[in-house]
Amino acid sequence: MVSLNTNVAAMMTQRHLSQAADQNVESQRNLSSGYRINSASDDAAGLQISNTLHVQTRGIDVALRNAHDAYSVAQTAEGALHESSDILQRLRSLGLQAANGSHEQDDRKSLQQEVIALQDELDRVAITTTFADKNLFNGSYGSQSFHIGANANSISLALRNMRTHIPEMGGQHYLGDSLDKDWRVTRDNQQFAFEYQDNEGQAQSKVLTLKVGDNLEEVATYINAQQSVVDASVTQDHQLQFFTSTLNAPEGITWKGNFADEMDIGSGELVTVDDLDMSTVGGAQLAIGVVDAAIKYVDSHRSEIGGFQNRVSGTIDNLNTINRSVSESKGRIRDTDFARESTVMVRSQVLQDATTALLAQAKQRPSSALGLLS
């Protein structure tokens, strides 16, 4: 039916033109923003899920930065301990050199000058090693937590004091009376024993029977061969001395037996790397035990830090894997599929051009009614 008042064809064409235009605008918006979901009306459920995933990725990004910071702290600490270990190894070499009987007193004094310089350097490393203005080894660091999860997951790193004067950098020193250089073990002084508490608080004892006729050097060698609690050595003044770094009980060691009575071994005295004096044979021999204890302490802490580094490294790898998976999931939900959206936009443009041409024709349709009047 031809109608002058109602152009149905034009109205239908206009509606399709509007739909094509809306589709074209939506496609351009999706392509320009890079997102398939730009508002809740586009996909309410998808928007909620993608926002949840976005929050998770943001948390993982922060966790990764924290984990890298934690690894950097541990790496800095391990480097400082490596330097400390090298210094202690050099001190031990000097101790072995100074304990050699072929050296004169002046030689040992020269060695002691290097010892003093190394002591200062060891303290300098402990005092000046810092990360982000935090000192790592002067005893102030304590234990710090690093948040390495998307939520509130954390890992702690504890760094110890590495100054030369702390008890862990040495042990207890016991010194007996000076004896005659011709002293020998007799049946009257061959019994030797000592009692102590181990690190678990359990009472322990060692009982030794010395060989009659042995001199003081041979006694020290025999004592060292029979147990590992104390290191025995002889000073230049013919004094038997003992050093132990394995005991932390405040009571120390109780010496017993007629040999101990003759030695009149005094109470224990704390000796650390800060107290090293290699200008004498006895001091050099004592220094070897002290440095060995310090090396054990440093290496133990290096092992802890190495384990921490491995743990953080594994965490970083895991976080990267999770972050990649979550980002891919978020992208599939929210990001624009450019191939598909480009096709939709071209289709809507073609429809828009076609409906525009058809609308022009539809608008001419009422004029055909004039032909009926002529």
Swiss-Prot record:
Compartments it resides in: Secreted; Bacterial flagellum
Family annotation (SUPFAM superfamilies): Phase 1 flagellin
InterPro entries, per database record: Flagellin, Flagellin_C, Flagellin_C_sub2, Flagellin_hook_IN_motif, Flagellin_N
Taxonomic superkingdom: Bacteria
Molecular function per GO: structural molecule activity
Principal location: secreted
Transmembrane stretches, start-end: none
Keywords carried by this UniProt record: Bacterial flagellum, Coiled coil, Secreted
Pfam families listed in its UniProt record: Flagellin_C, Flagellin_IN, Flagellin_N
Disulfide partners: none
Coiled-coil portions: 102-126
Cellular component GO terms held in the UniProt record: bacterial-type flagellum; extracellular region
Note in the entry: V.parahaemolyticus possesses two flagellar systems: a single polar flagellum propels the bacterium in liquid (swimming), while multiple lateral (peritrichous) flagella move the bacterium over surfaces (swarming). The polar flagellum is synthesized constitutively but lateral flagella are produced only under conditions in which the polar flagellum is not functional.
Quaternary context: Heteromer of multiple flagellin subunits including FlaA, FlaB/D, FlaC, FlaE and FlaF.
Family, as annotated: Belongs to the bacterial flagellin family.
Record function comment: Flagellin is the subunit protein which polymerizes to form the filaments of bacterial flagella.
UniProt protein name: Polar flagellin E
